[in-house]
């Protein structure tokens, strides 16, 4: 594998509505220091690919409204590597756009595509897995996805069912995908994890650029025609104008439905590196360190009394004192304070819309 051909694509167009009030449509969670470590989620995402993908091969696909924020937080990325979507069309058009643009400059490119708002605790193992995956796809026609080894019967993730009977001859860590499963109910999730060949779908994909472009041509010809028509305009002054005119013509469809569930050569690399998509306050509470009373605290000036099983998140200098709560979210940002039962956090979207 030639590292000069390795390209990282970060998808950063989401609005993070489940993480309100820290995350808002104007400033979603990928641009926030969720962990209180001094780095935002998108910065941490770029950080963990150091040594795998050269800095000049990093791409971010985002909304036009977030492009300036991306540049502020990742200043070393070239302007023409920040792709501005004029509207939201899910992950298939997003991946198609960046794939055709990369192919225009490097037809030998090997790509890893990742969301911008995930957390990885074991960086060394993550990098080992990514290197293994990219070695597998560099010279093959395979489409590879990472499958997280489940630690609990989770209903918030889709699942990948793998055929573990025979590993790939090219990489003993890689197995064929038998099927993709939608987010299950609790009973089904329990059944999945008992079988040992079901993995969480992390939404991290690895392939070479010719493989993904050819797959899009076969399974999504309408989307492919849009970006093939734009081929002469990539890296020119006309690119954004043509994208603004043509991108909205694409179907709103995820890459899972567009390619992954249709193609034949789909593989999974099962992995375990302390992964979480941190999509909810509950997952934040579950994965971060806790005090003796099972509270997660992020903030400089928090005092807790007779409080258990809570997640407290503040970003300002305000003093926060909590007494007598059990199982609550307490989150404060700007002029908004949220106090909500952890068990009812699915209602946060409802609260944020009011």
What do these predicted ranges mean?
Residues 1-10, 18-25, 36-115, 121-131:
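Conserved N-terminal catalytic core of the sugar/cofactor nucleotidyltransferase
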Residues 2-5, 209-354:
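Left-handed beta-helix
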Residues 11-12, 61, 112-115, 145-149, ...:
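Short beta-strand segments
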Residues 42, 98, 117, 160, ...:
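Residue-level signal for inorganic ion chemistry
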Residues 60, 83-84, 113, 144-148, ...:
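General beta-strand structural signal in soluble alpha/beta enzymes
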Residues 123-247, 267, 317, 341-342:
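Conserved core of the sugar-phosphate nucleotidyltransferase
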């Amino acid at each position: 594998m030639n590292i000069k051909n390795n390209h990282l694509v970060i998808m950063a167009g989401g609005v993070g509505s489940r993480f309100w009030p820290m995350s808002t449509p104007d400033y979603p969670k990928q641009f926030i220091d969720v962990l209180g470590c001094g780095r935002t989620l998108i910065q941490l995402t770029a950080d963990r690919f150091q040594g795998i993908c050269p800095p000049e091969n990093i791409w971010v696909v985002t909304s036009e409204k977030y492009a300036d924020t991306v540049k502020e937080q990742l200043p070393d990325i070239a302007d023409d590597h920040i792709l501005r979507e004029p509207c939201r069309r899910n992950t298939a058009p997003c991946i198609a756009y960046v794939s055709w643009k990369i192919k225009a400059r490097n037809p030998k490119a090997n790509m890893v595509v990742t969301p911008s708002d995930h957390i990885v605790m074991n960086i060394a193992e993550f990098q080992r897995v990514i290197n293994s995956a990219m070695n597998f796809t560099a010279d093959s026609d395979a489409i590879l996805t990472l499958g997280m080894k489940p630690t609990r019967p989770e209903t918030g993730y889709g699942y990948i069912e793998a055929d573990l009977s025979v590993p790939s001859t090219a990489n003993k860590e890689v197995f064929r995908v038998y099927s993709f499963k939608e987010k299950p109910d609790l009973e089904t999730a329990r059944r999945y994890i008992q079988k040992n060949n079901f993995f969480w779908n992390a939404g991290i994909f690895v392939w070479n650029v010719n493989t993904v472009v050819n797959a899009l041509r076969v399974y999504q010809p309408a989307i492919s025609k849009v970006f093939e028509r734009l081929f002469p305009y990539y890296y020119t002054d006309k690119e954004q104008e043509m994208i603004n005119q043509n991108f909205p013509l694409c179907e709103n469809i995820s890459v899972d439905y567009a390619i992954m569930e249709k193609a034949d050569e789909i593989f999974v690399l099962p992995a375990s590196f302390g992964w979480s998509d941190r999509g909810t306050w509950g997952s934040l509470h579950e994965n971060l360190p806790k005090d003796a009373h099972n509270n997660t605290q992020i903030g400089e000036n928090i005092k807790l009394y007779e409080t258990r099983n809570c997640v407290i998140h503040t970003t300002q200098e305000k003093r926060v004192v909590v007494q007598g709560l059990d199982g609550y979210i307490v989150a404060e940002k700007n002029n908004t304070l949220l106090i909500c039962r952890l068990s009812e956090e699915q209602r946060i979207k409802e609260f944020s819309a009011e």
